[in-house]
From Swiss-Prot:
Catalyzes the conversion of 1-hydroxy-2-methyl-2-(E)-butenyl 4-diphosphate (HMBPP) into a mixture of isopentenyl diphosphate (IPP) and dimethylallyl diphosphate (DMAPP). Acts in the terminal step of the DOXP/MEP pathway for isoprenoid precursor biosynthesis. The keyword Iron applies. Its cofactor is [4Fe-4S] cluster. One of its GO terms (biological process) is isopentenyl diphosphate biosynthetic process, methylerythritol 4-phosphate pathway. This is 4-hydroxy-3-methylbut-2-enyl diphosphate reductase. Transmembrane segments: none annotated. (2E)-4-hydroxy-3-methylbut-2-enyl diphosphate binds at residues 41, 74, 124, 167, 225-227, 269. NCBIfam families: ispH_lytB, PRK01045.1-2, PRK01045.1-4. CDD domains: lytB_ispH (cd13944). It comes from Klebsiella pneumoniae subsp. pneumoniae (strain ATCC 700721 / MGH 78578).
Length: 316
């Protein structure tokens, strides 16, 4: 059995930054550190940080006065930000800068009195945070997930209308929704490039190349990870058996026993150690050496806040 690795895969710059913010806060200030929502959607990462003293909460009211609070990579609404500001809390923001960019687009539309449409998945924390940047009662903020949603949407003034997208969507599906928006609302204005982030786009491109060669595709990522789910869906749409797994223990021998080639990739919030463990398990099941495919090189780095830049040797 051949093992192929998608490239790129795993951590993106925004996830790397968010995890570093929590780790550095724990190093500098000690436990407990409170984090609103899972800092990234990966069970292994969250469990590891919890063992170090991170406490994951959903409501600001759960945080005691004087504590340190970190916003997750998915971002928060202005209401949550204002609630935290009203408390005696030290706040660090781990929102991905590419999510913040979308927040700024929504806030700008709100100030101008334009109505805004967000393409995204209802209930996802990034969507809740982005929708929560709009606060102009004269306008309106709407959420759509599909071309069908667009057909049913009623706005107040289609002459002053803009759209934004969640950063972790399917590139193909989003393109269909944008086409539907432009057909329904010819004057709608969007970003120069859709808001789907570089890492999401690159990983979908990589899993497409992987699925062209593999009989079975394993996507390392947690069930609540939007971008990981999109990778598995894309491989399935290409007619391949694809499975979303948290770690190597999820692999069922029946999935791969008749496969000549198994492809492995990982969502943007999945650490490489999980991929290495999957490779080891596949080799136990008869796989050969893992061969990485060629792909786009990623060199993007997002700096942590200067207050949290720490040389661990200085605090040992």
């Amino acid at each position: 059995m051949q093992i192929l690795l998608a490239n790129p895969r795993g951590f993106c710059a925004g996830v790397d930054r968010a995890i570093s913010i929590v780790e550095n806060a724990l190093t500098l200030y000690g436990a407990p550190i409170y984090v609103r929502h899972e800092v990234v959607h990966n069970r292994y990462v969250v469990d590891s940080l919890r063992k170090r003293g991170a406490i994951f909460i959903e409501q600001i009211s759960e945080v005691p006065d004087g504590a340190i609070l970190i916003f997750s990579a998915h971002g928060v609404s202005q209401a949550v930000r204002n609630e935290a500001k009203s408390r005696d809390l030290t706040v660090f923001d781990a929102t991905c800068p590419l999510v913040t960019k979308v927040h700024m687009e929504v806030a700008r539309a709100s100030r101008r009195g334009e109505e805004s449409i967000l393409i995204g998945h209802a209930g996802h924390p990034e969507v809740e945070g982005t929708m929560g940047q709009y606060n102009n009662p004269q306008g309106g903020m709407y959420l759509v997930e599909s071309p069908e949603d667009v057909l049913k949407l009623e706005v107040k003034n289609d002459a002053r209308l803009s759209f934004m997208t969640q950063t972790t969507l399917s590139v193909d599906d989003t393109s269909d929704v944008i086409d539907a928006l432009r057909a329904r609302f010819p004057k709608i204005v969007g970003p120069r490039k859709d808001d789907i982030c570089y890492a999401t786009t690159n990983r979908q491109e990589a899993v497409r190349a992987l699925a062209e060669q593999a009989d079975v595709v394993l996507v390392v990522g947690s069930k609540n990870s939007s971008n990981s789910n999109r990778l598995a869906e894309l491989a399935q749409r290409m007619g391949k058996a694809a499975y979303l797994i948290d770690d190597a223990s999820d692999i069922q021998e029946a999935w791969v026993k008749d496969a000549a080639c198994v492809g492995v990739t990982a969502g943007a919030s999945a650490p490489d150690i999980l991929v290495q463990n999957v490779i080891t398990r596949l080799q136990e099941l008869g796989g050969g050496e893992a061969v990485p495919l060629e792909g786009r090189e990623e060199n993007i780095v997002f700096e942590v806040p200067k207050e949290l830049r720490v040389d661990v040797r200085e605090v040992e």
